[in-house]
Regions:
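Short, cationic/aromatic linear interface patches
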Residues: 85-143
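Disulfide-bonded cysteines in secreted/extracellular proteins and peptides
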Residues: 8-11, 34
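Long, charged low-complexity interaction segments
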Residues: 23-78, 144-162
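Residues immediately within or flanking Cys/His clusters that coordinate Zn2+
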Residues: 5-8, 28
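Canonical RING-type zinc finger of E3 ubiquitin-protein ligases
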Residues: 16-24
């Protein structure tokens, strides 16, 4: 008994409803995992846009510009939570002011610094040190985080020996 294959609404792959778990979304079908991932992404995006709206209040942000920026950053591999934490790092932790004309263009420049900052805060050793002996250990967080990336040379070296 074969059934007609359906196409997943989110990933575009075809699958059989009898074999794989699925969810019916309006008049279409989707893999259960794809649907759960879509719901999670939607919740993350909503949280990010709510935070941007909170940053810009009482002004209304330029959603056309911000939407294209967020889509571009998502295509570059950044997550919505990563963008949210980058904005929190830049505006709350560093104390910078919001410029209504710039949108969220600071994200690609501060993304790695914010990631390093939050991984340092969430480090289990740091958390354990805070709990056990906060008097004897001076736990300090530097404001600037230096990230060193190794880069391969662009040009090949020339060998003059024959």
């Amino acid at each position: 008994m074969t059934t007609k294959k359906v196409i997943c609404k989110y990933c575009g792959a075809s699958f059989s409803r009898e074999i794989e778990p699925y969810v019916k979304v309006s008049n279409r079908y989707a893999h259960k995992m794809c649907h759960e991932k879509h719901i999670e992404d939607t919740a993350q995006f909503r949280r990010l846009t709510d935070y941007i709206k909170e940053l810009y209040s009482p002004m209304e942000p330029d959603w056309a510009m911000i939407g294209t920026q967020l889509k571009k950053y998502k295509d570059e591999g950044m997550t919505y939570y990563g963008m949210l934490y980058t904005l929190e790092f830049f505006f709350k932790v560093k104390g910078n002011k919001v410029d209504k004309d710039c949108g969220v263009g600071i994200i690609p420049y501060q993304y790695k610094k914010a990631k390093a900052y939050y991984t340092n805060i969430n480090n289990t050793y740091t958390q354990a040190a805070k709990i056990t002996a906060t008097e004897s250990i001076n736990i300090g967080q530097k404001q600037e985080v230096i990230i060193i990336e190794n880069k391969a040379p662009d040009k090949k070296l020339i060998n003059f020996e024959y």
